[in-house]
Amino acid sequence: MAKLKYNIPEPLPTLLEEKKSLYGLRTYISLFSSAGVGCYGFKQENYHCIATVELLERRLRIQQYNQKCIYNSGYTCGDMTAQETKDKVFEQLDMWKRNYNIQEPDVIIATPPCQGMSVANHKKGDELKRNSLVVESIVMIR
């Protein structure tokens, strides 16, 4: 299969500073992103991170070190069940829609913890709250 080519002028940081329209820009949002390892391939393929959410600050710092998002405001350390966390993601999306003429992100990566559903985790107690993060992802994406 032939690789699609997008006409995105470089360097991107200069375009962002000039606030030019970036028609054709490929974007994504990452929920439950841990240290951002799962997003590495997207970055390699010139996708741009609108927002990333991780519960643990130390994992989010690794993403920042690797410059996953263009804007510092794209990094959110928070609980995906909290409305404040969801609002931050939607604020970033709205900013990209206004400034860079995107309609919606091309990809939404949602990798909620699945320990409660794992056979290997049969000895742990009720994991209903953690398992409900799958539902939280679906509701947010709608």
Predicted features and spans:
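Conserved active-site and SAM-binding loop architecture
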Residues: 1-142
